[in-house]
Amino acid sequence: MLSKQIPLGIYEKALPAGECWLERLRLAKTLGFDFVEMSVDETDERLSRLDWSREQRLALVNAIVETGVRVPSMCLSAHRRFPLGSEDDAVRAQGLEIMRKAIQFAQDVGIRVIQLAGYDVYYQEANNETRRRFRDGLKESVEMASRAQVTLAMEIMDYPLMNSISKALGYAHYLNNPWFQLYPDIGNLSAWDNDVQMELQAGIGHIVAVHVKDTKPGVFKNVPFGEGVVDFERCFETLKQSGYCGPYLIEMWSETAEDPAAEVVKARDWVKARMAKAGTVEAA
């Protein structure tokens, strides 16, 4: 039976590091989460997941079935290292191959949404050519995703090219494809000079999930909840009033903390209290 509750998930990098997904999903369940978002970042270790064997993929599926904790989304940040906008043809080809493998992986294990990093390039200088190549790369990527019935969703970034929902909507209109949508990060959105509530309202109808974290201007990671600039309650209220009923994902990087689970519990309670005030979830 489908739950009527708003799904609340936790980012893989918030939990203890390791490759045993059964342990990770059991812990997430113990901590009260509905799902875990997988990370495929630019490290060789996490990139190697895209080359998992059939048995390794089945082990993940079996862990999901056994625990009842889903893995419905993937944060694909590997394109920092292999950007779709790269002027180096070999690097760009690697970026497209990573996209192909990620879409195939998602199709195999039941991941519905791949969150994309909105960088034309990250470690190089951007220009009109890198942006053109990025657009063309997205077009190729969405064609692959369409055939696999996997949604690609653009994150709102810590980078000027994609630092607002309005900018991401421009790409959605350009691609004009139901398999390309938006996955805003209310922390990143709030760290720039955006009218955050108007931006959230503008994205309704295209938002498939929401990242939840705190930020400060120029500081996009590891800001403790409540110490940054994000008006969480208003963001949750705006999304609820606009009709958004999809998942929220607490994004943290506590996997190397002395006690990751304790850090996650503290963040979970803080976020759920703000969601309850906004009427997004029932008060504890």
Curated annotation (Swiss-Prot):
The keyword Isomerase applies. It catalyses: L-ribulose 5-phosphate = L-xylulose 5-phosphate. It is an enzyme of class 5 (isomerase). Keywords: Isomerase. SUPFAM superfamilies: Xylose isomerase-like. Gene3D superfamilies: Divalent-metal-dependent TIM barrel enzymes (3.20.20.150). Pfam families: AP_endonuc_2. Its EC number is 5.1.3.22. It comes from the Bacteria. Induction: Induced by L-ascorbate. Repressed by UlaR. GO terms for biological process: L-ascorbic acid catabolic process. GO terms for molecular function: intramolecular oxidoreductase activity, interconverting aldoses and ketoses; L-ribulose-5-phosphate 3-epimerase activity. Pathway: Cofactor degradation; L-ascorbate degradation; D-xylulose 5-phosphate from L-ascorbate: step 3/4. Catalyzes the isomerization of L-xylulose-5-phosphate to L-ribulose-5-phosphate. Is involved in the anaerobic L-ascorbate utilization. Belongs to the L-ribulose-5-phosphate 3-epimerase family. NCBIfam families: hxl6Piso_put, PRK13209.1, PRK13210.1. HAMAP family: UlaE. This is L-ribulose-5-phosphate 3-epimerase UlaE. The lineage of its organism: Bacteria, Pseudomonadati, Pseudomonadota, Gammaproteobacteria, Enterobacterales.
